[in-house]
Amino acid sequence: MLSSIANFFDRMVRRYLPDAFLFAIILTFIVFILGIVFTDNSPVQMVEFWGGGFWNLLEFAMQMSLIVVTGYILANSPIVKRLLGKISKLANTPGQAILLVTFVASIACLINYGFGLVVGALLAIHVAKRVPSVDYRLLMASAYSGFLLWHGGFSGSIPLTIATQGHFLEETMGIIPVTETLFSSYNLFIVGTLLISLPLLNRLLMRPTRNVGEIDPELLNLQASVIEEEEVEEAEEKTSTPAERLENSRVISILIGLLGLAFILYHFVQNGLNLNINIVNFIFLFFGILFHGTPRRFLNSATDAVKNAGGIIVQFPFYAGIMGMMISSGLSDQLSMWFVNISNDFTLPWLSFISAGILNFFVPSGGGQWAIQGDIMIPAAIGLDVDTAKTAMAVAWGDAWTNMVQPFWALPILAIAGLKVRDIMGFCVMILFWSFIPISIGLLFF
């Protein structure tokens, strides 16, 4: 039955959902019109808000582009190819492939969201190479489903923010340690339930072999070849210039790689196991340099990798423009206040979760959402005598929840997989529906 429902949503999404870039453009027009209708802003002001915010995510766009590029480079190195290949051997059937990829991606996203996005996609490619009969689209949707857990894990921006001295709501709610957020009973229940149930759900979404979505064989061969190509040891090249000798020098890679390792060690000594997107990119980059052996091999791999970052580079400014309109026009505040006004001490965390899920379509950034909703939800929680830590985590889970049907965060996986958003979103709708249940139970009854 589940596979039949998933098949229905898959057909609908593949027929009517536009490409991720067009989705961003459509959202732009929707927010533009809503801002004129529901606020006192004129069309000229909405244009100003849009243009003013358009370049506000440049740093983040570069970070996400690099996580695709550096992750690809690292995965194309001999050591990582062998490691992912060994893990992929745990799956011998399509069902095992779905279970393995979902579980590994979920664990990786709990550790760090950027790490999890890349590792899940790359493992899925290895598994698809080993089990060619698996539905490649469902496999990539399974890899993306692990991202649902990220805001309840160690890189969650909201719990880490409110645990940091000097955060913008410190005078209102104080400093909230992660023992009251990440390691609370409700968060452990939600994470544990999803960690167990998501692999099983994705396994149930498998369809009969005759109905498996067909993927262009050239696509899978192309993506797999980047990662699984035969390892060929280059013979000592007869180089005629000093520049060519430097390009093929292992010494250069070792020296710069050791410098990178020194900083990585320093970072963890100073900050503990604090992973953020910058240090993840740094680790991927310098291990990629070391594992490829020579600068020339590294650059050859980088040339292949950058081809996958184009969609991310183009789309992020449009989402920044959408965020600019939502925030500057007051639309985001209106949405949050509407949910606050219909809340009581029992329903506030749950309605905070719902409102965050809706807002996430237009402001797909956990930190950005907290900057908008924190100032509204936390005073409301204090006024209703509701746990502020739980209210904050409700916003965090709302952000994570609708990521399943918001193409923004799927871009890195889609770039690596060589797929379009419509290829996985039909399955992700089912994941969205199911995950609503354990998240709601955790926020209402724990």
Give, region by region, the residue ranges found by the protein language model.
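Hydrophobic transmembrane alpha-helices of multi-pass small-molecule transporters
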Residues: M1-V69, F183-I196, L200-G311, Q315, ...
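Flexible loop linkers connecting adjacent transmembrane helices
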Residues: S4-F9, Q45-W50, A75-A91, H126-D135, ...
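Membrane-interfacial loop-to-helix junctions in multi-pass transporters
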Residues: D19, W55-A61, S88-L100, V131-L139, ...
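Membrane-interface helix termini and inter-helical loops of multi-pass transporters
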Residues: T39-G52, H167-V178, F268-L275, S328-N341
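Early transmembrane hairpin of solute transport permeases
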Residues: L57-F168, F362
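Hydrophobic alpha-helical transmembrane segments of multi-pass integral membrane proteins
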Residues: L90-L123, V314-S329, V340-P379, L384
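Alpha-helical transmembrane segments of multi-pass membrane proteins
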Residues: G95-C109, S133-F154, G174, V178-T179, ...
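Membrane-core helix-loop-helix motifs of multi-pass transport proteins
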Residues: L123-I215, A410-G442
